[in-house]
Protein backbone atom coordinates (compact mmCIF):
# COMPACT_ATOMS: atom_id res chain seq x y z
CA UNK A 1 0.00 0.00 0.00
CA UNK A 2 1.27 3.48 -0.91
CA UNK A 3 1.92 5.69 2.09
CA UNK A 4 0.07 9.01 2.32
CA UNK A 5 2.11 11.94 1.05
CA UNK A 6 3.09 15.46 2.05
CA UNK A 7 3.70 17.94 -0.77
CA UNK A 8 6.66 20.30 -0.52
CA UNK A 9 6.42 23.66 -2.29
CA UNK A 10 3.58 25.72 -3.70
CA UNK A 11 4.69 26.95 -7.10
CA UNK A 12 3.78 25.84 -10.59
CA UNK A 13 5.88 22.70 -10.40
CA UNK A 14 4.20 21.74 -7.13
CA UNK A 15 0.78 22.05 -8.76
CA UNK A 16 1.86 19.67 -11.53
CA UNK A 17 3.31 17.21 -9.01
CA UNK A 18 0.09 17.29 -6.99
CA UNK A 19 -1.95 16.66 -10.13
CA UNK A 20 0.26 13.72 -11.08
CA UNK A 21 0.03 12.23 -7.59
CA UNK A 22 -3.75 12.43 -7.73
CA UNK A 23 -3.72 10.72 -11.13
CA UNK A 24 -1.77 7.92 -9.44
CA UNK A 25 -4.32 7.73 -6.58
CA UNK A 26 -1.80 8.92 -4.00
CA UNK A 27 -3.42 10.54 -0.97
CA UNK A 28 -1.91 13.95 -0.11
CA UNK A 29 -2.57 15.08 3.46
CA UNK A 30 -1.29 18.62 2.95
CA UNK A 31 1.42 20.96 1.75
CA UNK A 32 4.45 22.53 3.44
CA UNK A 33 5.66 25.88 2.14
CA UNK A 34 7.28 28.78 4.04
CA UNK A 35 5.56 31.48 1.97
CA UNK A 36 2.10 30.01 2.55
CA UNK A 37 2.84 29.72 6.26
CA UNK A 38 4.05 33.34 6.44
CA UNK A 39 0.87 34.50 4.68
CA UNK A 40 -1.29 32.61 7.15
CA UNK A 41 -2.97 30.58 4.42
CA UNK A 42 -4.80 27.44 5.53
CA UNK A 43 -5.69 25.99 2.12
CA UNK A 44 -3.81 25.82 -1.18
CA UNK A 45 -4.99 24.07 -4.34
CA UNK A 46 -7.46 22.05 -2.29
CA UNK A 47 -4.82 20.96 0.22
CA UNK A 48 -4.42 21.85 3.88
CA UNK A 49 -1.40 24.07 4.56
CA UNK A 50 0.59 22.27 7.25
CA UNK A 51 3.11 25.07 7.76
CA UNK A 52 6.70 25.69 6.75
CA UNK A 53 9.25 22.91 6.31
CA UNK A 54 9.62 22.76 10.09
CA UNK A 55 6.07 21.34 10.26
CA UNK A 56 7.55 18.02 9.14
CA UNK A 57 8.98 17.67 12.65
CA UNK A 58 5.47 16.70 13.76
CA UNK A 59 5.22 13.74 11.38
CA UNK A 60 6.78 10.29 11.48
CA UNK A 61 8.97 9.71 8.39
CA UNK A 62 8.09 6.02 8.52
CA UNK A 63 4.40 6.78 7.95
CA UNK A 64 4.52 9.32 5.09
CA UNK A 65 6.40 10.04 1.88
CA UNK A 66 7.38 13.45 0.54
CA UNK A 67 6.42 14.80 -2.87
CA UNK A 68 9.14 17.18 -3.99
CA UNK A 69 7.29 20.08 -5.58
CA UNK A 70 10.29 22.41 -5.61
CA UNK A 71 11.13 23.50 -9.14
CA UNK A 72 14.15 25.20 -10.68
CA UNK A 73 13.39 28.67 -9.28
CA UNK A 74 14.59 30.69 -7.44
CA UNK A 75 17.75 28.55 -7.41
CA UNK A 76 18.76 25.34 -9.15
CA UNK A 77 20.22 24.10 -5.85
CA UNK A 78 17.15 24.61 -3.63
CA UNK A 79 15.50 21.37 -4.72
CA UNK A 80 18.71 19.36 -4.33
CA UNK A 81 19.49 20.84 -0.91
CA UNK A 82 16.00 20.05 0.41
CA UNK A 83 16.23 16.48 -0.87
CA UNK A 84 19.61 15.89 0.74
CA UNK A 85 18.63 17.45 4.06
CA UNK A 86 15.42 15.51 4.57
CA UNK A 87 16.66 12.24 3.11
CA UNK A 88 19.51 12.51 5.59
CA UNK A 89 17.09 12.51 8.54
CA UNK A 90 15.09 9.54 7.32
CA UNK A 91 12.42 10.89 5.00
CA UNK A 92 11.44 8.96 1.87
CA UNK A 93 10.71 10.73 -1.42
CA UNK A 94 8.13 9.34 -3.81
CA UNK A 95 9.08 8.51 -7.40
CA UNK A 96 6.22 9.42 -9.75
CA UNK A 97 5.59 8.26 -13.31
CA UNK A 98 2.55 9.81 -14.96
CA UNK A 99 0.04 7.27 -16.34
CA UNK A 100 0.54 8.65 -19.86
CA UNK A 101 4.35 8.36 -19.75
CA UNK A 102 6.27 5.38 -21.11
CA UNK A 103 9.21 4.04 -19.09
CA UNK A 104 10.78 0.86 -20.47
CA UNK A 105 10.71 -2.12 -18.09
CA UNK A 106 14.49 -2.25 -17.59
CA UNK A 107 14.97 1.46 -16.86
CA UNK A 108 16.64 2.04 -13.47
CA UNK A 109 14.91 4.74 -11.43
CA UNK A 110 16.33 6.32 -8.30
CA UNK A 111 14.23 8.02 -5.62
CA UNK A 112 12.49 11.38 -6.01
CA UNK A 113 12.17 10.85 -9.78
CA UNK A 114 9.36 12.62 -11.63
CA UNK A 115 8.44 11.51 -15.16
CA UNK A 116 5.74 13.84 -16.41
CA UNK A 117 2.84 13.40 -18.82
CA UNK A 118 3.71 12.17 -22.29
CA UNK A 119 7.40 11.57 -21.55
CA UNK A 120 9.30 8.56 -22.92
CA UNK A 121 12.32 6.86 -21.32
CA UNK A 122 13.69 4.04 -23.44
CA UNK A 123 15.48 0.77 -22.76
CA UNK A 124 18.72 0.65 -20.82
CA UNK A 125 18.50 4.14 -19.38
CA UNK A 126 19.33 5.10 -15.79
CA UNK A 127 17.83 8.05 -13.91
CA UNK A 128 19.60 8.92 -10.67
CA UNK A 129 17.95 10.43 -7.58
CA UNK A 130 16.02 13.66 -7.97
CA UNK A 131 15.78 13.76 -11.76
CA UNK A 132 12.87 15.57 -13.41
CA UNK A 133 11.80 14.32 -16.84
CA UNK A 134 9.32 16.98 -17.79
CA UNK A 135 6.30 17.00 -20.09
CA UNK A 136 6.78 15.29 -23.50
CA UNK A 137 10.52 14.71 -23.01
CA UNK A 138 12.06 11.89 -25.07
CA UNK A 139 15.04 10.05 -23.58
CA UNK A 140 16.24 7.32 -25.91
CA UNK A 141 18.08 4.07 -25.19
CA UNK A 142 21.05 3.71 -22.84
CA UNK A 143 21.10 7.24 -21.45
CA UNK A 144 22.45 7.97 -17.97
CA UNK A 145 21.08 11.06 -16.21
CA UNK A 146 22.87 12.25 -13.07
CA UNK A 147 21.36 13.26 -9.76
CA UNK A 148 19.09 16.32 -9.62
CA UNK A 149 19.20 16.99 -13.35
CA UNK A 150 16.18 18.53 -15.05
CA UNK A 151 15.16 17.75 -18.61
CA UNK A 152 12.66 20.49 -19.52
CA UNK A 153 9.46 20.10 -21.56
CA UNK A 154 9.81 18.84 -25.10
CA UNK A 155 13.56 18.17 -24.97
CA UNK A 156 15.01 15.20 -26.86
CA UNK A 157 17.98 13.16 -25.69
CA UNK A 158 19.14 10.71 -28.34
CA UNK A 159 20.74 7.37 -27.49
CA UNK A 160 23.71 6.75 -25.17
CA UNK A 161 23.91 10.25 -23.69
CA UNK A 162 25.58 10.72 -20.31
CA UNK A 163 24.58 13.71 -18.19
CA UNK A 164 26.37 14.50 -14.94
CA UNK A 165 24.81 15.79 -11.75
CA UNK A 166 22.73 18.95 -11.82
CA UNK A 167 22.46 19.26 -15.60
CA UNK A 168 19.67 21.40 -17.05
CA UNK A 169 18.46 20.74 -20.60
CA UNK A 170 16.12 23.52 -21.72
CA UNK A 171 12.74 23.20 -23.36
CA UNK A 172 12.81 21.86 -26.89
CA UNK A 173 16.57 21.25 -26.93
CA UNK A 174 18.03 18.26 -28.77
CA UNK A 175 21.17 16.40 -27.68
CA UNK A 176 22.59 14.09 -30.35
CA UNK A 177 23.75 10.50 -29.68
CA UNK A 178 26.68 9.63 -27.41
CA UNK A 179 27.25 13.20 -26.21
CA UNK A 180 28.50 13.73 -22.65
CA UNK A 181 27.07 16.64 -20.64
CA UNK A 182 29.32 17.58 -17.72
CA UNK A 183 27.91 18.17 -14.26
CA UNK A 184 26.11 21.48 -13.87
CA UNK A 185 25.97 22.13 -17.61
CA UNK A 186 23.11 24.28 -18.88
CA UNK A 187 21.69 23.67 -22.35
CA UNK A 188 19.58 26.61 -23.49
CA UNK A 189 16.07 26.12 -24.82
CA UNK A 190 15.89 25.10 -28.46
CA UNK A 191 19.58 24.25 -28.77
CA UNK A 192 20.98 21.36 -30.80
CA UNK A 193 24.02 19.86 -29.07
CA UNK A 194 26.38 17.88 -31.28
CA UNK A 195 29.48 17.52 -29.10
CA UNK A 196 30.51 17.03 -25.49
CA UNK A 197 29.81 19.87 -23.05
CA UNK A 198 32.21 20.70 -20.22
CA UNK A 199 31.07 20.72 -16.60
CA UNK A 200 29.46 24.01 -15.66
CA UNK A 201 29.29 25.31 -19.24
CA UNK A 202 26.30 27.08 -20.76
CA UNK A 203 25.63 26.08 -24.37
CA UNK A 204 23.23 27.41 -26.97
CA UNK A 205 22.49 27.47 -30.64
CA UNK A 206 22.52 24.91 -33.42
CA UNK A 207 26.01 23.60 -32.77
CA UNK A 208 26.00 23.98 -29.01
CA UNK A 209 28.82 26.50 -29.07
CA UNK A 210 30.07 27.68 -25.70
CA UNK A 211 30.06 31.44 -25.05
CA UNK A 212 33.44 33.18 -25.04
CA UNK A 213 34.74 34.12 -21.60
List the predicted regions and their residue ranges.
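Small/polar loops that bind or transfer phosphate-bearing groups
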Residues: 9, 70, 177
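Active-site phosphate/pyrophosphate- and oxyanion-stabilizing loops and adjacent acidic/basic residues
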Residues: 19, 84, 191
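Hydrophobic, well-ordered beta-alpha structural blocks that scaffold small-molecule cofactor pockets
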Residues: 1-53, 57-60
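Structural signal for interior beta-strand "rungs" in well-ordered beta-sheet cores
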Residues: 95-211
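Short glycine-/acidic-enriched loop or helix-start segments at secondary-structure transitions
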Residues: 16-18, 41, 77-79, 197, ...
Amino acid sequence: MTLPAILIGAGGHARVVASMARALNISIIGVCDPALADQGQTNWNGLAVLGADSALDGYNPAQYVLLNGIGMLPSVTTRRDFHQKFQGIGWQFATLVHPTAWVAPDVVLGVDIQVMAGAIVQLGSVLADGVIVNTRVSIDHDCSIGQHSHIAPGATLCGAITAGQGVFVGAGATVLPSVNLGGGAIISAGSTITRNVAAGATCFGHFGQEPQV
